[in-house]
């Protein structure tokens, strides 16, 4: 029994993943003088979260957020439900209040590549990402005010402008290591004055 491989089954590694393995890993190992190659920080996952507070009043609003996140990330998001009831917000336990997607592996690398090279430069008056949003363990979280900057979103079909939070989780132990990794991957940080 022989296994046939066709052109369609050949898997191409994402270009940012290849660049990380070939160049960035070696540079970071030299910069931080790691003894073992496994000490070099790497990306673990990217979480894209879209909070939709209006979904408490109108349950159809969540469908637009799910559709947008599916187009942006390439996978179906999980609907986030309220954990407890809050009377002031007219919110009951179990109501949908957002959607989130966790990207790992090749999808994560492709998303980060598209985010850095295509989406972020399309933001109006964009001067770079703040370098102060690291959590102390090398993970970075930032927010986007609208979904329009992604090429996958048809600008004429937008029913509502929605923002999102993007968290990049790394194996870095300190913020400096995380910042060096993300800068090498192409994240445009503001210069600290």
Curated annotation (Swiss-Prot):
Domain of life: Bacteria
GO cellular component, one term: ribosome
Pfam families: Ribosomal_L5, Ribosomal_L5_C
Disulfide bond listed as a keyword: no
Entry's Gene Ontology molecular function annotations: rRNA binding; structural constituent of ribosome; tRNA binding
Cited InterPro entries: Ribosomal_uL5, Ribosomal_uL5_bac-type, Ribosomal_uL5_C, Ribosomal_uL5_CS, Ribosomal_uL5_dom_sf, Ribosomal_uL5_N
This protein's record includes keyword Cytoplasm: no
Keywords: Ribonucleoprotein, Ribosomal protein, RNA-binding, rRNA-binding, tRNA-binding
Any one GO BP annotation for this protein: translation
Stated role: This is one of the proteins that bind and probably mediate the attachment of the 5S RNA into the large ribosomal subunit, where it forms part of the central protuberance. In the 70S ribosome it contacts protein S13 of the 30S subunit (bridge B1b), connecting the 2 subunits; this bridge is implicated in subunit movement. Contacts the P site tRNA; the 5S rRNA and some of its associated proteins might help stabilize positioning of ribosome-bound tRNAs.
Family named by the database record: Belongs to the universal ribosomal protein uL5 family.
Subunit record text: Part of the 50S ribosomal subunit; part of the 5S rRNA/L5/L18/L25 subcomplex. Contacts the 5S rRNA and the P site tRNA. Forms a bridge to the 30S subunit in the 70S ribosome.
Database matches in HAMAP family: Ribosomal_uL5_B
Protein name: Large ribosomal subunit protein uL5
Organism: Renibacterium salmoninarum (strain ATCC 33209 / DSM 20767 / JCM 11484 / NBRC 15589 / NCIMB 2235)
Lineage: Bacteria, Bacillati, Actinomycetota, Actinomycetes, Micrococcales
């Amino acid at each position: 029994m022989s296994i046939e491989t066709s052109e369609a089954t050949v898997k191409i590694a994402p270009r940012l993943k290849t660049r990380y393995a070939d160049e960035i890993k070696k540079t970071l190992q030299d910069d931080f003088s790691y003894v073992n190659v496994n000490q070099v920080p790497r990306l673990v996952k990217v979480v894209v979260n879209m909070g939709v507070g209006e979904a408490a009043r109108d349950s159809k609003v969540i469908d637009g957020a799910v559709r947008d996140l599916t187009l942006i990330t390439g996978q179906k998001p999980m609907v986030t439900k309220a954990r407890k009831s809050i009377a002031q917000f007219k919110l009951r336990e179990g109501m949908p209040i957002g959607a989130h997607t966790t990207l790992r592996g090749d999808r994560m690398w492709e998303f980060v590549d598209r985010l850095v090279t295509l989406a972020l430069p399309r933001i109006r008056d964009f001067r770079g990402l703040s370098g102060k949003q690291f959590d102390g363990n090398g993970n970075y979280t930032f927010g986007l005010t609208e979904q329009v900057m992604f090429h996958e979103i048809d600008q004429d079909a937008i029913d509502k402008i929605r923002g999102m939070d993007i968290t990049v989780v790394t194996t870095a132990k300190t913020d400096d290591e995380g910042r060096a990794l993300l800068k090498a991957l192409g994240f445009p940080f503001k210069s600290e004055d």
